[in-house]
Amino acid sequence: SSSAASDVYKRQVLMDWLQNKIWPAEAGLNDEDIYWGTMLSIAEMLKTGTTCFADMYFAMDKVAQAVNETGIRASLSRGLVGLTPDADEKLQDNEMLFKNWHGKADGRIRVMFGPHAPYTCPVPYLKKVVAKAGELNAEIHMHLCETAGEVSDCVKEHNMTPIKLMNSLDMFDCGTLAAHCVHVSEADLDIMADKKVRVAHNPQSNLKLASGIAPVPA
């Protein structure tokens, strides 16, 4: 659903890219922009043989509509940021997305809860997300260990890596799709293996933003 921004901002570190480019650009998008951006992305995916994708964004009803109309499969999450005044409202949006779309389109649409990342979701908010996901027997999609800075900041604040922090919150017991996982330790990998955490490797984004390369062979 963010195809329109995919070729615009090259070679920028993640936080500069998000704060100064992507988030301001996204503030100007409306539901129709997201619908047609999703349709474009789906066309590009199908053209190259991709038949399933995972997306975390906003106006996800429009994304689900595009998935329903095109025949592709998708795992959809409402992107959740716990730092804004409407954070609880967005969690309710994700709940409604789950109730309205999970298992729909002949089972092609799966809905997860989408806390964006450790640096945008404080622990009290993450606890709410995990509780709601557990209540609905839903899984969770989250960006984890994308950059070295994310990991070091998390260790400074919590004395734990992002993987260890999420494990301490019982997030992985819900079933988790973790995006990126570039900077993970051997101890992190042991936790991920034990909890059956699935990784969505994103080499194009990680290389464009010089975040690093996930240890996929591990």
Model segments located where?
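Short, acidic/polar
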Residues: 32-42, 58-60, 90, 94
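Active-site-adjacent C-terminal substructures of enzyme catalytic domains
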Residues: 171-218
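Short acidic/histidine-rich active-site segments
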Residues: 3, 140-147, 200, 210-211, ...
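Short acidic/polar active-site loop segments enriched in Thr and Asp
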Residues: 51-52
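Single conserved hydrophobic/aromatic residue that forms the stacking wall/gate
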Residues: 1-5, 9
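Metal-coordinating catalytic core of metallo-dependent amide/deamination hydrolases
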Residues: 62-182
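Active-site mouth loops of central-metabolism enzymes
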Residues: 23-35, 112, 116-118
